[in-house]
Amino acid sequence: EALYQEKDKQAAQAAAKAEQKAATQSDEGEWTQPEGADWAEPGMKSYTCPSCGAELICDETTAATSCPYCGNTTIVPGQLSGMQKPDYIIPFKLSKEDAIAALKNHYKKKPLLPKIFSAQNHIEEIQGVYVPFWLFNGSADADIRYNCTRSMTHREGDYDVTDTQHFMVRRAGTVKFEKIPVDASSKMPDENMDSIEPFDYKELKAFSNAYLPGFLADKYDVSVDDCAPRADARCKSSCESALRSSVTGYSTCVPEEENIHIRRGKVQYAMLPVWMLHTKWNGRDYLFSMNGQTGKLTGDLPVSWGRFWAYFAGIAGGLAAVLSVLLFAL
């Protein structure tokens, strides 16, 4: 029975993948995966984390003592082979000290953070990691129709009268995309990577191992095909935003009908710099990610419920005071 359940599960997954592929083929072409050289060069070594499965690469002068994703301290040396060499890299611009300072500054801007968190919270591990990204290039043809309104209010006797005009607005055009990033590591939370964007591609360099000493590099484990739905969604979202920004002068603007056709092009493989900071407080681990180029930082923080309810009570008290004044005036 367990065997049949497993086969049913595999069949359902295969059907879902086929359906997804059919949906993406309604656009034009497929994303072209880069054909990079083998990365197995002299002076390079790899580690594997038995806890989360991360595969990490570094040069022979760099000691990897723990996993930057899960904090496991028993990572195992492995054999470097069959790894695709990246096309590009953005070197680290900010130091470990910059990352620590950014984390402390991050604490200051959180009014609901427990006071003792920053005092008792200790950085267990901080590592610079080159995170693998697929960079998608292509274009999209879009034709979107909006229902827009323009409202004006005037006074007639004792009444305020609002006149609303309705307009059908159409926008069409072609939007080109260059290097739309999608992280290619299953260990890295997608929301973390989305939060620390953008990266400045003006500092993109041809890949060289010379940028690796002192840092780790994560091997990609999410293929171009598996990243394609996210890339398509980001292309469409960017296209919608570009056309929507051209519709101005209206009170409201709601898209009624849209037709977006993606033309898929070349995909490039890049390593982008991220500082990973592990902290611990009250027996719980907290992971923070900082853009190693721009300093933008994100991560989860605990909430002081005492501060939360005090903050909420303050807002409620203010609203009650305003309401009482209004009622008294009436």
Regions found by a protein language model. Give the residues of each.
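Short, non-ligating residues that shape and space the ligands of small metal-coordination modules
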Residues: L3-E6, C58-D59, V76-P77
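Charged, low-complexity helical/coil segments in non-catalytic cytosolic or luminal regions
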Residues: G82-K280, D285
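N-terminal cysteine/histidine-rich coordination modules
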Residues: E1-A37
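Short, intrinsically disordered, charge-biased short linear motifs at domain edges
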Residues: Q33-A40, S51-C58
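Residues immediately within or flanking Cys/His clusters that coordinate Zn2+
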Residues: M44-S46, A64
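Extended hydrophobic
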Residues: F136, Q268-G318
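Short cysteine-rich clusters marking metal-coordination/redox-active sites
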Residues: C49-C52, C67-C70
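Juxtamembrane boundary at the C-terminal end of a transmembrane helix
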Residues: V322-L330
